[in-house]
């Protein structure tokens, strides 16, 4: 994939009515979201290089800004994380920096242009991407995406995870909010996996599996983690694959069966019920039925054995065939494919 400046053509030059960039929050929206403190001020210049254009993301672990490289006149994204949280040094972004550095050059990993820290926060300057696929789903008139689009999202996500797993890491936080696409004509159909703050090694650089902890704790987002994570077992690539399943289910149906449950034990119970093949018919009815084979295939895998990636990818390819990865996604055709389901 050519990432040179000369090769980049703004996608809006080809699709002038296509709005795929993450939205910058207004002052009113920042107040409504109770964002009391911005660690850098819009309009300021960070490190004599990056002009702060506005806030495009905010979460429990930090903030994301759209920035302009004043030397190259290119838009980028800057992610920051306070160095201290509740008087404790935070290490989430330090891990993310390390993993991103090792993964540079992989198709589904965003380009990192700079990283470091000052006396207040750690930061990463990276490639500017589209809004996440969860937001694309919410924009759909039906609140869901077509099976052709979801199949290609799941296929590319699993490919991204294979690269990460091959490096000896499990992601542990696969979900729609961490999946985006490129914003240039050359990469608008390329999926990028984000947020490596929860990654953990499951094998050494030489390929030796790391011994499991007796109690691995709970890491991830409740809605998208596997049954094994609820049971505080050590996570493996198998658990990442289950998060792909839950992500695909939410995107194609519009919501997960446990969407309105708040008790983590109840969520665990519904997920266990879904895994009982003889009882999951109700949860895989209608459009969700397209995911039955993928679900069964993961269940047949041993969590301690390497995933049969090619077999799983072929299963996902059936969801979008005969379309290709390079054909328009739902948000490019005004969600016409979704409306024709």
UniProtKB/Swiss-Prot annotation:
Q: What class of enzyme is it?
A: transferase
Q: Where is the active site?
A: 173 (proton acceptor)
Q: Which SUPFAM superfamilies match?
A: Protein kinase-like (PK-like)
Q: Name one GO molecular function term.
A: protein serine/threonine kinase activity
Q: Under the cellular component aspect of Gene Ontology, which terms does the record hold? A: cytoplasm; nucleus
Query: What name appears for this protein in its UniProt entry?
Result: Putative casein kinase I C03C10.2
Q: Which domain of life is it from?
A: Eukaryota
Positions with a binding annotation for ATP = 56-64, 79
On whether ATP-binding is a keyword of this UniProt record, the answer is yes
Q: Which InterPro entries match?
A: CK1_Ser-Thr_kinase (IPR050235), Kinase-like_dom_sf (IPR011009), Prot_kinase_dom (IPR000719), Protein_kinase_ATP_BS (IPR017441), Ser/Thr_kinase_AS (IPR008271)
Q: What is its EC number?
A: 2.7.11.1
Biological process GO annotation list? signal transduction
Report the residue ranges that make up the Protein kinase domain in this protein.
50-326
Q: Which family is this protein grouped under?
A: Belongs to the protein kinase superfamily. CK1 Ser/Thr protein kinase family. Casein kinase I subfamily.
Q: Does the keyword Lipid metabolism apply?
A: no
Looking at the UniProt entry, the stretches that span the membrane are: none
Q: Which reaction does it catalyse?
A: L-seryl-[protein] + ATP = O-phospho-L-seryl-[protein] + ADP + H(+); L-threonyl-[protein] + ATP = O-phospho-L-threonyl-[protein] + ADP + H(+)
User: Which keywords accompany this UniProt record?
Assistant: ATP-binding, Kinase, Nucleotide-binding, Serine/threonine-protein kinase, Transferase
Q: Which SMART domains match?
A: S_TKc (SM00220)
